[in-house]
Amino acid sequence: MEVAPEQPRWMAHPAVLNAQHPDSHHPGLAHNYMEPAQLLPPDEVDVFFNHLDSQGNPYYANPAHARARVSYSPAHARLTGGQMCRPHLLHSPGLPWLDGGKAALSAAAAHHHSPWTVSPFSKTPLHPSAAGAPGGPLSVYPGAAGGSGGGSGSSVASLTPTAAHSGSHLFGFPPTPPKEVSPDPSTTGAASPASSSAGGSVARGEDKDGVKYQVSLSESMKMEGGSPLRPGLATMGTQPATHHPIPTYPSYVPAAAHDYGSSLFHPGGFLGGPASSFTPKQRSKARSCSEGRECVNCGATATPLWRRDGTGHYLCNACGLYHKMNGQNRPLIKPKRRLSAARRAGTCCANCQTTTTTLWRRNANGDPVCNACGLYYKLHNVNRPLTMKKEGIQTRNRKMSSKSKKSKKGAECFEELSKCMQEKSPPFSAAALAGHMAPVGHLPPFSHSGHILPTPTPIHPSSSLSFGHPHPSSMVTAMG
């Protein structure tokens, strides 16, 4: 449906003609706002009707605007609905319904544009001439417009929680705490009963949601501010709003020492902290307080365990065990070891006449025999024949049992590990981490998660990543 340029385009909007939105919902559309001198420019009126049509049927005169509208449809579907009709915003003291027509429509258009200015998915305005004009009725930044500064600022501040909450899944930066906007009872009472009844239920539901969000946000900010890890977060909500495409992002704060309450998340904890905090503490043997003790039996001054005899005197571990088992003092002179059976002088086998054997045995008559002859006789009850005699002693390689193998292998592994720990420097020393943790100081102090604790940064960052402070406009471009 084509409309003449001089005719107001919003007069022929199909939503109004088909009575999808009754006049009682927007009383300003059916009364004294028909004069062309009081109407807004066509571009701003398109924006106004874009938020009126919640069914997704906006009116645009040319296909270029329609294609641009399609790109905003997913985010528009999340932001339309109940939040577009808030009586306490539209009936604020600076924006009455029944006063001048331009102020009311400006507030509605600014009400529509405010989610895009605070959403992380923000793009350039659909109508640059309307949104970018300095001092015009529509302004991207709160309080920048000349005539409706208070109204646009309040609408932007009231919609900040919803927009920031919708984008919190992708950007974990905590949003700026919203300003509480309470409806003015005098101006609200002066409004038409039809409009207040139409949007009253929606406004009450949204007020409850807004109060819940503000309470939860304040509690989370208190928790983060009181945490020893991030004491600097308590002052984040008081930062002034900057003129920026994404005002929910806080201003750039360098990673200073006061932002980190614990050395675990501060780069200085890795770089300048003592290396002993990461090195395994070698347990030094605790010196016992018994340096002056001495064993009354052998005179030893060092022993793994001090014992006492019957009279209370100190004994070393060896003398104490001997006294306990034998009931007498441990002899100081070691007894001479008995010569092994293989070295007995003058002993020979009664069967094969050999003088060397690993073990001397005795036959039934009591005569000494070598190990081979004694075993043969024990098994066969017959003397071992002399033809089986060999010059050398045949021995066999006994296989170690599995238990002894495991114990020996475990001991060897433990020794190797202890040697490696002593020889090599610890892997988490300050010198080893100095090269890897250098770019951490350029990172913003906020993590990309919604939790209280920040996400630990990787120790080995990729060389392709840029650790400079990213400009939010480039991030929005990448999102698009």
Swiss-Prot record:
Residues recorded as bearing Phosphoserine in the entry: 73, 192
Sequence position, cross-link Glycyl lysine isopeptide (Lys-Gly) (interchain with G-Cter in SUMO2): 389
BP term (GO), one: negative regulation of endothelial cell apoptotic process
Entry-linked SMART domains: ZnF_GATA
Segments forming GATA-type zinc fingers: 295-319, 349-373
Pfam families the UniProt entry points to: GATA (PF00320)
Gene Ontology molecular function: C2H2 zinc finger domain binding; chromatin binding; DNA binding; DNA-binding transcription activator activity, RNA polymerase II-specific; RNA polymerase II cis-regulatory region sequence-specific DNA binding; RNA polymerase II-specific DNA-binding transcription factor binding; transcription coactivator binding; zinc ion binding
Subcellular location: Nucleus
Coarse class of the protein's main subcellular location: nucleus
SUPFAM superfamilies: Glucocorticoid receptor-like (DNA-binding domain)
Residues covered by region (Disordered): 166-208, 457-480
Record-level GO cellular component terms: cytoplasm; nucleoplasm; nucleus; transcription regulator complex
PROSITE patterns: GATA_ZN_FINGER_1, GATA_ZN_FINGER_2
Chain intervals with Low complexity compositional bias: 183-201
Subunit structure and binding partners: Interacts with BRD3. Interacts with AR and CCAR1. Interacts with MDFIC.
Alphabetized PANTHER family for the sequence: ENDOTHELIAL TRANSCRIPTION FACTOR GATA-2 (PTHR10071:SF149), TRANSCRIPTION FACTOR GATA FAMILY MEMBER (PTHR10071)
Name this polypeptide is given: Endothelial transcription factor GATA-2
Record organism: Mus musculus
